[in-house]
Amino acid sequence: MSGLGIMVLTLLLFMFMATSHQDAGEKQATQRDAINVRRRRSITRRGDEECNEYCDDRNKECCGRTNGHPRCANVCFG
């Protein structure tokens, strides 16, 4: 095989390795984001039982707490 052919094959191999590494990094970042979302939700759910009961009595949704008091609304934004 000529020197030019070897260089082309080597370049293609490096390009393949670089794109595979990028894809793995993106997948890992996506998994990390999913874990962070799960952690946030579990923390929020634990403290919201009292808020949910308080707002359910008023036929509204619990939107979190403001200054330690449950904040209820028909629809929660953010």
Curated annotation (Swiss-Prot):
Propeptide: 25-44
UniProt-listed InterPro entries: Conotoxin
Tissue note: Expressed by the venom duct.
Transferase in keyword set: no
Gene Ontology CC: extracellular region
Entry's free-text remark on domains: The presence of a 'disulfide through disulfide knot' structurally defines this protein as a knottin.
Stated name of the protein: Conotoxin TsMSGL-12
Signal peptide range: 1-24
Phenylalanine amide modified-residue sites: F77
Keywords noted in UniProt: Amidation, Cleavage on pair of basic residues, Disulfide bond, Knottin, Neurotoxin, Secreted, Signal, Toxin
Cystine pairs: C51-C63, C55-C72, C62-C76
Compartment annotation: Secreted
Pfam families per record: Conotoxin
Domain of life: Eukaryota
Source organism (scientific name): Conus tessulatus (Tessellate cone)
Family: Belongs to the conotoxin O3 superfamily.
Example of a GO MF term: toxin activity
